[in-house]
Amino acid sequence: MKVLALRHSVAQVYADTQIYTHDETKDDYENAFLISNLTTHNILYLNYSVKTLQILNKSGIAAVEIQEMDELFTLIRCNFTYDYIDDIVYLHDYSYYTNNEIRTDQHWVTKTNIEDYLLPGWKLTYVGYNGNDTRGHYNFSFKCQNAATDDDAIIEYIYSNELDFQNFILKKIKERMTTSLPIARLSNRVFRDKLFKTLVSDHSRVVNVGPRNESMFTFLDHPSIKQFSNGPYLVKDTIKLKQERWLGKRLSQFDIGQYKNMLNVLTTLYQYYDMYHEKPIIYMVGSAPSYWIHDVRQYSNLKFETWDPLDTPYSDLHHKELFYISDVTKLKDNSILYVDIRTDRENTDWKAWRKIVEEQTINNLNIAYKYLSTGKAKVCCVKMTAMDLELPISAKLLHHPTTEIRSEFYLIMDIWDSKNIKRFIPKGVLYSYINNVITENVFIQQPFKLKTLRNEYVVALYALSNDFNNREDVIKLVNNQKNALITVRINNTFKDEPKVGFKDIYDWTFLPTDFETNESIITSYDGCLGMFGLSISLASKPTGNNHLFILSGTNKYFKLDQFANHMSISRRSHQIRFSESATSYSGYIFRDLSNNNFNLIGTNVENSVSGHVYNALIYYRYNYSFDLKRWIYLHATNKAGIEGGRYYEHAPIELIYACRSAKEFAKLQDDLTVLRYSNEIEDYINKVYSITYADDPNYFIGIKFKNIPYEYDVKVPHLTFGVLNISDSMVPDVVAILKKFKSELFRMDVTTSYTYMLSDEIYVANVSGVLSTYFKLYNAFYKEQITFGQSRMFIPHITLSFSNKKVVRIDSTRLNIDFIYLRKIKGDTVFDMTE
């Protein structure tokens, strides 16, 4: 949902939009809670409170102040990610298709012939890093830029088996127009940029597990971050390959040679970062014009020095000349060298050309060896061709996508590799590598071992759920890693499947109860965003591809009502109960009936079950930004930090009742996952709360009324307002609590409206209006370790007779309290009080 804050109402009506006017009788937190549970996508928030907007944004719900109608029109028609700290709106708006254009934030693409293969009459537009160049389109009171591009489709095309780009991009645009927007992917780059800038400033050592190409720009400015990936393809790994011949295959209609060069250099750069944790000088020989340097410059101040007879416009220092092996002495330490020398073939005879290529390959290799033979802190990437070669067994092979698969590949070596054992590799084996292997990632660092790192902050986004990881080892890492942000796939199945298929792999599934964490926040993507200064206009949907975000060691853990809080906890319930269910009271009715409380009068205002916990369990797929386990634990240990607002603390028994209702709901729905989750949450409640039951009571609290509107034959009809199991020495403690609650007890609006047979020969009158105070009293006794209440649900009633009587119904009648007392069962009254 998105909240657009206005000072005045607007005349225009928008689809899927609701108006909410700030309620001055309620505080900012309660207003935020009410807004978050509205069911429409767009909320126009009138007479807004800035504090309420802050609360929503911290909860991951995008809430933006609107000053002009243009701002309203722009934000209401598309989704966006909001940086609420720096007041920047990142639109995810594809309406630019109506201008017959596709967009890119990678400058190199604009220098290709891609426009020859677009839809008729279409053009390509460069919009800069995260759409930064579009800011001029929006003259708003907040910074605004459109981060939507088609780079995902362009890159997917490059790695696909499709050659016809026009058909491919047409298909992708149609998909985009007919399926739900994958907004988490769109906002992920904004999130990653913010995340790692924050972590690097707060932690001296940061580890990142499983980065992919979409992160290749994110880490350019963070050489200190240790990357773990799937490892490199080494020269020695070719021993598994059978010999093949030249294949020759076109991968792309438009020229992607620059993309290949960029990937080669970035792969080399991240190898250097992995070894030396600082930025090198980047030397490049050949590969002009290297327009992609402009893309790298958007993210980092890396320095480039280049050699090529052709211009390289974005180089810091360009030598418009050939580079010879004698020039290697000009290259400094603390650098990387990219050698991409190959003379254009033009009209040269094939055999003569092949001889030239092989000579240049040997020359390239000699340049690399000479560069690595002296000095320190050096990594080299060199262009090779398939031919009989001796190569270091530990050197890394690269074959990033290029326009046509021919005979070229690349080799990365560091100083140690260049001096390592060399092995003869036949030409046919290298052709086999070229024909069958595409390097899919610029990150080729070693795989991560699932072990706790003592002094590092570990980030593992979408990297650990794969079933080639041991599930118990993943759980152990989450439990024991002190500082971390780790994601795992949430169990969205209804049959409690331990793993699910995704693309061509299988992932383990998890629930929050799979983890034993006391100082970790377990939330959703949008809940996590709120903790890093971001919010989003479209909440996560239960697609089956959803992840739990687990933050360990965060200073926000105790800020219970600010982050990963209960905002939107009833939203799914509202959507169902007002559109699909038998009555809007269905949730209240079901919760009472499933706990054998059959008095449904006023059930919507006097419910005996925690609606928060019930909704968090049965609709966990729709709102898992609310960290239920943390909420339970912090209340149980009395450590919950509440910033403000009228905050109701549930008695532990209300939480137990909610689990019981959720379990019955799950059985009716045949939802085995909710059934397990509810059982495990109930076990967790019993673990963190020291709940004792007065199932063998020796004292009770009684309430005598001045008026009973029914006939009775018991001596003193009264309401048993709870039973206790205490020693006589604890009586003063009980009395002290009763005195503390005196005012609230006598203010209860107690009513009755019918009689019924509680069981055979026990004739009683119903009592309404006391449950809220009962649970508050329960909490007060619990905190003083006084055993109060039984394991079965408290159903308030007044016993009228120990015989069978006819049921009577009357108009709701107020019962006036005469006095309240504490009495020993089968004993004397030890305390009483009147108003």
From Swiss-Prot:
The active site is at 718 (for 2'-5'-phosphodiesterase activity), 720 (for 2'-5'-phosphodiesterase activity), 797 (for 2'-5'-phosphodiesterase activity), 799 (for 2'-5'-phosphodiesterase activity). CDD domains: capping_2-OMTase_Rotavirus. Pfam families: Rotavirus_VP3. It is found in: Virion. Keywords: GTP-binding, Host-virus interaction, Hydrolase, Inhibition of host innate immune response by virus, Methyltransferase, mRNA capping, mRNA processing, Multifunctional enzyme, Nucleotide-binding, Nucleotidyltransferase, RNA-binding, S-adenosyl-L-methionine, Transferase, Viral immunoevasion, Virion. Its EC number is 3.1.4.-, 2.7.7.50, 2.1.1.56. Residues 693-835 are annotated as: 2'-5'-phosphodiesterase activity. Residues 556-692 are annotated as: GTase/RTPase activity. Its main location: virion. The keyword Cytoplasm does not apply. GO terms for biological process: symbiont-mediated suppression of host innate immune response; viral process. It catalyses: a 5'-end diphospho-ribonucleoside in mRNA + GTP + H(+) = a 5'-end (5'-triphosphoguanosine)-ribonucleoside in mRNA + diphosphate; a 5'-end (5'-triphosphoguanosine)-ribonucleoside in mRNA + S-adenosyl-L-methionine = a 5'-end (N(7)-methyl 5'-triphosphoguanosine)-ribonucleoside in mRNA + S-adenosyl-L-homocysteine; 5'-triphosphoadenylyl-(2'->5')-adenylyl-(2'->5')-adenosine + 2 H2O = 2 AMP + ATP + 2 H(+). It comes from the Viruses. GO terms for cellular component: viral nucleocapsid. Interacts with VP1. Interacts with VP2. Belongs to the rotavirus VP3 family. Contains a bipartite N7-methyltransferase domain, a 2'-O-methyltransferase domain and a GTase/RTPase domain. The C-terminus contains a phosphodiesterase domain that degrades the 5'-triphosphorylated, 2'-5' linked adenylate oligomers produced by the host cell in response to IFN stimulation. Multifunctional enzyme involved in mRNA capping. Catalyzes the formation of the 5' cap structure on the viral plus-strand transcripts. Specifically binds to GTP and displays guanylyltransferase and methyltransferase activities. Has affinity for ssRNA but not for dsRNA. Capping activity is non-specific and caps RNAs that initiate with either a G or an A residue. Together with VP1 polymerase, forms a VP1-VP3 complex positioned near the channels situated at each of the five-fold vertices of the core. This is Protein VP3.
